[in-house]
Amino acid sequence: MLRLLMIADDFTGALDTGVQLAAHGIPTQVVVGQADLSACSSTVLVVDTETRHLPAAKAAKAVEELTRSAVENGVGCIYKKTDSALRGNIGAELAALLKASGARNLPFLPAFPQIGRTTEKGVHYIKGVPVNESPFGIDPFEPVRCAEVTKLIHLQTDVPAQSLQPGETAADKTGILVYDAATAADLEAAGQQLFQNGTPPVLAGCAGFAAFLPELLGLSDGSVVETPQLDPRLLVLCGSVNPITLRQMDTAEKAGFTRLRLTPRQKLEPGYWASADGKAALAEIEQMLAANPRCIIETNDAGGNQLTADYAAARGIDLDGMRVGISGSVGQMFGALFGSEHLGTLLLTGGDTLLQCMNSVGARELEPVCELESGIVLARFTYQGRTRYVITKSGGFGQEDLLVELADRIAKH
């Protein structure tokens, strides 16, 4: 029976939140796009609506329709998963959930203190820096313009939103209620207060608060899923432009990873990987994988992305066209390489990259298994009758030596 529906706006976010339940042995399924809630056999269903880059009205409609379906199918709790850096259509999607659910209020706990993302006096911080002054404030696709959470919400909706003081209850309030949390203990305390009189019909937040849902919903039996043995060879496929990920790749390269940057043509020429030049490039990549146990293939140019921007401008490709074109090309490359005997464990970073790669091999569903690090998810899917594993990571997660540590751990496991 479906006990919890989680609605995410991108693929990596769907996984890093769903794994908070799956890691406790709770049957959890992650799907992209449409979902038949009446036919779902999992206890937890996470739906990636792919609305992060959509206009606000379209994003709201997708969330509203899914929420109405959940209400009609008697789902006990709906959790709107938001980005822990507040990217995307935050206000529009929260308002849509509240409206379609018919709930009196929507508790919103945006913090993820476990990785240094806190909400204090209504302001959202990334490791002590207001989010709009952090790297997320200059994100080329979804820059976060405001750190005060209620103001950010009101950029897209007129639904009332207010920040609650520590210890203040939601019982007599309406609208979107923003909770502070500087520590994981703050999130846990807020959760216990919210669940005092039963399960709230709607909640919102990121993976930070979702980590407490197994206990709060009474779904956890105390078990912990163990990490399966993985192929010690590691290929990192990076489509993220986040500075955190760029530093991680620099560190990995210095530690001996072989690093390949795709050219502007490889990223943006339609059908490139099916061309003679593309097939030759694929053969060279296979040789690289055969000769090197730790590899990176990335979509960033050396020293910035001006070369790709110039290439796109000369062909009339706008910023969104670049985003879609690059992730699509990476997906085509991935599909062509997927059957290679030299392909070991995969780590995909960036939600668009993950989606296109999974599309290329016909995988619409992923099953989160466990977290290797906070926000770093091991998931599995079925391909041609075989179970395949993939590691997923949002661009903004992890320490600088993350890739090196993961590679070492996989090799020793």
Question: Model-predicted segments: where are they?
Answer:
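C-terminal structural cap/anchor segments
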Residues: 288, 292-349
